[in-house]
């Protein structure tokens, strides 16, 4: 019997409609028939520690920047016309952007890279600090100093620029980025421009609104607010989120650059991309494209936002206001921040971190991907075709190469489990994943799957200059595998090498812009139906194989600390999408 799973058919589960019976009522994934080996109900990792109030925002004045606390004096306690909280620092302080310098995974990874490549320590620390500690790095470079993170560098409480470093990706950095060469290679990898030679109070600080009122900010923080259309342009985000890192050969010689993350270039090669000559004001999107800010800094639905608490009378409420949510997909690290907020000295309370985490979960489960199933039975063989649709404007998983997503498919009969592929394990491993079981190997991309130890994992696998699998960024010369889900409209055959598809997916005609089709062929033996087919798209921020490689440097303080935090954290993946069908 043939069963199609569509929005109007037997069952369809994107995240807008949870698991459903034909009636459309919510039903637990294990409600019909025997429970699967692993539940496929909606899930995401949970925090394990008690609530904490959080420290105050960072307050400092340096040559070119001010701390977030100074900005919060006027830009907190904001509401839209319906009374919803629009406070900028209230939303920002619990994001990964605000905590970019305190992210313990990042700190551990940078320390590991430096230890493995000591000859280019200065290059590594400057490259990483430029986007994770951007105010301190920019201030140092403006004074012709040496950017340093460890030992007596920015991480030392005694360092002159410690406060500005620990304020992360903060207000007076992003809003001072000049409209110079944005969207070009000359601005990527942290090559943003700030007018460090301009003295107060004439130093420009950019916003998305025309004809700003200048005098309040000139007097309070020494900036002159001016209209800057770049603040509503993905190219501004691309200055750090298009990152090429140097790599070395086995002898330690720098041999080239590697595209560590390229979501802006992926976006530009998709239906979501907006041409540079079509830059538009906030709230005035004229076409089918969508900027980074429209997803990651969603507008107030109600409008009527007074953007400053002490606003001069001529400053009118704004109907288009970008909430500083900076929502991404990093649920796991937000949990780690919650679990360790005191030791990390976070400015965000437990509740604010929870708010950001819940926004992240909602984005993953409502706006990221959809699953659909078509299934049929012929004798003792079931054929199940799983379709995965990517709804975001870049590859998914996105950005840093530690992330992966995979299909967990389980088939049950009244007698028990018939077949299961991609079962998540409690320690974060994936049953059947070669990389988890045999170091130096990896799971290939599949068009068709017939064995339980074959798993469709959407990920990147990196190789060094000798062609061996590596998890050391500064040894990575190329991708052996990149089958991450492509955005709609992405033409893989004409993609530039830095955003290409690598491995078996490059030749898979069922893997293309916006979707992937995976066919499962399952022998039922002497088991009788009805058969319940359940599929889930699961997502993890740090793959176990990536983490196991980091453990090699557990003698380093930052690595030791993060290993401890990782080991006690909840490692269950986020359920991004689910689908279910019955075959009789």
Question: Which residues does each PLM region occupy?
Answer:
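Bacterial N-terminal signal peptides
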Residues: 3-17
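Signal peptide processing junction and immediate N-terminal pro/mature segment
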Residues: 13-32
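Primarily the internal scaffold of c-type cytochrome electron-transfer domains
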Residues: 33-55, 78-115, 145-502, 508-512, ...
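Local sequence-structure signature of Cys/Sec-based thiol-disulfide redox active-site neighborhoods
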Residues: 54-73, 122-125, 233
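N-terminal catalytic scaffold of extracellular/periplasmic and nuclease hydrolases
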Residues: 71, 106-127, 137
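Conserved, well-structured interaction surfaces
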Residues: 125, 130, 134-141, 151
């Amino acid at each position: 019997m043939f069963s199609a799973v569509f929005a109007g058919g037997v069952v369809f589960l994107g995240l807008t409609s949870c698991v459903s019976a034909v009636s459309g009522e919510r039903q637990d994934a294990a409600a019909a028939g025997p429970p699967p080996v692993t539940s496929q109900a909606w899930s995401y990792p949970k925090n394990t520690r008690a609530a904490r109030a959080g420290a105050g925002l960072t307050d400092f004045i340096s040559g070119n920047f001010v701390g977030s606390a100074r900005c919060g004096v006027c830009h907190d306690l904001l509401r839209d016309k319906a009374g919803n909280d629009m406070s900028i620092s209230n939303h920002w302080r619990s994001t990964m952007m605000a905590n970019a310098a305190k992210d313990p995974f990042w700190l551990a990874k940078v320390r590991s890279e430096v230890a493995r490549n000591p000859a280019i320590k200065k290059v590594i620390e400057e490259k990483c600090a430029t986007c994770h500690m951007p105010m301190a790095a920019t201030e140092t470079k403006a004074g012709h100093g040496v950017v340093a993170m460890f030992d007596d560098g920015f991480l030392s409480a005694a360092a002159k620029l410690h406060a500005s470093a620990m304020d992360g990706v903060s207000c007076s950095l992003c809003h001072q980025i000049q409209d110079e060469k944005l969207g070009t290679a000359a601005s990527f990898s942290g090559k943003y421009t700030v007018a460090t030679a301009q003295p107060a109070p004439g130093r420009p600080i950019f916003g998305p609104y025309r004809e700003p009122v200048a005098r309040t900010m000139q007097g309070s923080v020494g900036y002159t607010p001016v209209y800057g259309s770049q603040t509503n342009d993905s190219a501004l985000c691309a200055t750090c989120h298009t990152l090429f890192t140097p790599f070395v050969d086995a002898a330690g010689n720098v041999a080239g650059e590697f595209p560590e993350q390229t979501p802006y270039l992926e976006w530009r090669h998709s239906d979501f991309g907006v041409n540079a000559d079509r830059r538009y004001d906030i709230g005035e999107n004229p076409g089918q494209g969508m900027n980074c800010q429209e997803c990651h800094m969603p507008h107030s639905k109600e409008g009527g936002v007074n953007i400053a608490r002490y606003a001069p009378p001529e400053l009118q409420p704004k109907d288009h206001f970008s909430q500083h949510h900076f929502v991404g997909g990093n649920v796991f690290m937000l949990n780690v921040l919650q679990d360790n907020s005191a030791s990390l000295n976070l400015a965000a309370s437990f509740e604010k971190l929870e708010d950001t985490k819940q926004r992240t979960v909602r984005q993953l489960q409502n706006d990221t991907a959809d699953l659909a199933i078509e299934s049929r039975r012929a004798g003792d063989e079931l054929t199940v075709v799983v379709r995965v649709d990517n709804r975001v404007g870049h590859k998914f998983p996105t950005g840093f190469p530690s992330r992966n997503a995979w299909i967990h498919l389980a088939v049950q009969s009244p007698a028990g489990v018939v077949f299961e592929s991609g079962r998540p394990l409690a320690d974060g491993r994936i049953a059947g994943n070669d990389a988890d079981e045999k170091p130096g190997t990896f799971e290939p991309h599949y068009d068709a799957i017939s064995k339980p130890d074959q798993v469709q994992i959407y990920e990147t696998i990196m190789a060094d200059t000798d062609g061996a699998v590596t998890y050391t960024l500064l040894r990575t010369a190329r991708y052996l595998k990149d089958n991450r889900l492509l955005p709609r409209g992405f033409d893989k055959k004409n993609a530039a090498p830095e955003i290409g598809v690598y491995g078996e997916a490059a030749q898979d005609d069922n893997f293309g812009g916006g979707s992937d089709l995976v066919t499962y062929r399952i022998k039922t033996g002497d088991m009788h139906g009805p058969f319940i087919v359940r599929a889930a798209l699961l997502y993890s921020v740090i793959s176990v194989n990536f983490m196991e490689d980091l453990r090699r440097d557990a003698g380093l303080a930052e690595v030791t600390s993060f290993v401890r935090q990782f080991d006690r954290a909840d490692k269950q993946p986020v359920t991004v999408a689910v689908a279910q069908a019955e075959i009789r």
